[in-house]
Amino acid sequence: MKKLVFFLVCLFTMQVVVADNDKPVTFEQLPQAAQSFVKKHFADRNVAFSKMDKDIFDVTYDVMFVNGDKLEFDKQGNWKEMKCKHGLVPETAVPAQIVKYVKTNYPEAKILQIEKDRYEYEVRFMGHRTKRFFQWSGKMGERF
């Protein structure tokens, strides 16, 4: 019983220590790929701040714009999520197959958020309560 309590205390302590590892970074301290992506697709928006978030096994970078829009990048600078609260995700930043599918099947829809993980893209639209999932190939798909 003592070992179990000790283990739980250690586990809780580790969670507290790791929980807040956000570190402000300048735009120039972001990975080069992230800097290029922002300059190419979000040049019309002003960066409010950027931060590095260190987890136990991973590092991510967040870029927040003055208008509230947010980008998240992995440690190599590849985008993981684009979330636009007061704007739209630029079509140039979205994979071409997804843009084509959305224009064909939802001509009035505008992309507000897109997130990618290891298996798929998740897309949310303005004016639609639904979200759509796309396989890495860009094909509309069911969730795995």
Residue spans for each PLM region:
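Bacterial Sec-dependent N-terminal signal peptides
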Residues: 1-22, 38
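Interaction-mediating elements
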Residues: 20-144
